[in-house]
């Protein structure tokens, strides 16, 4: 205590302490040797409200210090070792949770070399005080898995956030969406058309109106790059892309074609993320795409396709990818149907454990024309037509109309365009 009281007359910097250990060579982020803690502070809330929110969330705090001003310093355990990316991800996750509960975080404190107030030092007429140590959960891991109650008082006092969409009214941000259908019906063509629509902000299929040009991350393993290249050229020609449209595709699309790799592996009765998942997560965080596409699911899933626990965990990891995008994103995952359900269009037609389709908020199915439809519409070449239906929609009204698509022929063979079968000219 004599040492503490003895520094009262020293220069101001003595009243600070760094929240993470340094190497002795400097005091920047590059000099941090271990990412143990992050700093949480708010200059807009009362200290009583700061204390209430943090303690109610059971956040794992190594220490809580009264700054001698208008804030508390919460030194939070993040246990990120020497992994800076993990540190940044956990800080962002922590700050996001706090913001949802009304704690307006000073985000300037996010870097690991931040300083906190040294307890026992006077700041003007106020003393910097150590209020608590080791409160909340014992560790970051324990805190992350604990359920958190919703802030119902906020529900009552405020309006809910507006649901945002990647494709207006039909593909919401924050959701896992996709197509479940048997092979050969056009999943890949439709998906690539939607990708190019999203990149350009140009409506290609009338039902799917993109919310402006956006970045897209595309993992596609069923077809080689050469085939996707050919399809790209055909789609661009069929939809009369301008030089500006092509430029936007070049700027906004990052694709990894013809490569499959497991994002999960079996572990302890469930699955755990692999190094490939961490790589994809890093790409999402770096690139900030609003649409993330995996086609097909089976080529990126490492586990038992019929195990609900494992599939559910895998889908949960895909959902976590949306949280790495600051402005929100949707994940589009294509999957094959089971053999016995190939002739059906329903939300239950996907192959394997039901946890996969349960996790998807929006689903589409594909089929060919029935004999009655061929006769009713007087179709001469029914193999050119594909029926697309919105079989599931949890966050918005389900699109109830049948979406009819027609294949181009000749040099543009394979390209699908949406058609209105009530119009005679569409049937030619």
Regions found by a protein language model. Name each.
Residues 75-82, 104-130, 253-265:
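Short, conserved secondary-structure transition motifs
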Residues 7, 11-70, 77-93:
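Signature for HUH/AEP ssDNA processing cores
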Residues 178-179, 184, 188-189, 291, ...:
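Phosphate-binding/switch region of NTP-binding enzymes
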């Amino acid at each position: 205590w004599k040492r503490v009281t003895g520094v009262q007359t020293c220069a101001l910097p003595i009243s600070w302490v760094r929240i993470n250990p340094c190497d002795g060579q400097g005091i920047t982020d590059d000099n941090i040797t271990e990412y143990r803690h992050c700093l949480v502070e708010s200059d807009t809330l009362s200290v009583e409200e700061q204390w209430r929110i943090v303690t109610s969330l059971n956040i794992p705090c190594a220490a809580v210090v009264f700054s001698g001003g208008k804030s508390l310093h919460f030194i939070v355990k993040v246990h990120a070792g020497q992994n800076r990316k993990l540190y940044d991800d956990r800080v962002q996750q922590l700050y996001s949770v706090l913001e949802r509960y009304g704690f307006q975080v000073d985000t300037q404190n996010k870097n690991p070399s931040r300083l906190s107030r040294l307890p026992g030092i006077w700041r003007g007429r106020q003393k910097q005080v150590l209020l608590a140590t080791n409160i909340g959960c014992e560790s970051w891991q324990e805190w992350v898995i604990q359920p958190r109650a919703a802030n119902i008082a906020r529900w009552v006092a405020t309006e809910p956030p507006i649901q945002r969409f990647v494709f207006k009214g039909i593909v919401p941000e924050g959701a896992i969406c996709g197509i479940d259908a048997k092979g050969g019906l056009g999943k890949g063509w439709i998906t690539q058309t939607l990708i190019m629509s999203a990149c350009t902000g140009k409506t290609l299929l009338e039902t799917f109106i993109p919310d402006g040009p956006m970045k897209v991350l595309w993992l596609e393993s069923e077809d080689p790059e050469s085939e996707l290249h050919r399809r790209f050229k055909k789609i661009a020609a069929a939809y009369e892309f301008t030089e500006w449209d092509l430029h936007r595709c070049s700027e906004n699309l990052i694709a990894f074609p013809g490569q499959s790799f497991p994002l999960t592996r079996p572990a302890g009765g469930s699955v755990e993320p692999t190094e490939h998942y961490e790589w994809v997560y890093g790409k999402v965080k770096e690139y900030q795409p609003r649409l993330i596409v995996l086609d097909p699911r089976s080529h990126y899933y490492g586990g038992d396709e019929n195990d609900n626990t494992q599939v559910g965990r895998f889908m949960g990891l895909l959902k976590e990818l949306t949280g790495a995008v600051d402005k929100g994103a949707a994940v589009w995952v294509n999957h094959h149907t089971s053999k016995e359900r190939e002739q059906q269009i329903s939300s239950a037609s996907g192959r394997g454990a039901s946890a996969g389709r349960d996790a998807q908020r929006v689903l589409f199915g594909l089929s060919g024309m029935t004999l009655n439809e061929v006769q009713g519409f007087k179709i001469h070449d029914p193999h050119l037509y594909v029926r697309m239906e919105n079989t599931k929609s949890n966050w918005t009204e389900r699109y109830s109309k049948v979406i009819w698509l027609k294949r181009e022929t000749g040099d543009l063979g394979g390209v699908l365009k949406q058609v209105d079968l009530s119009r005679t000219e569409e049937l030619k």
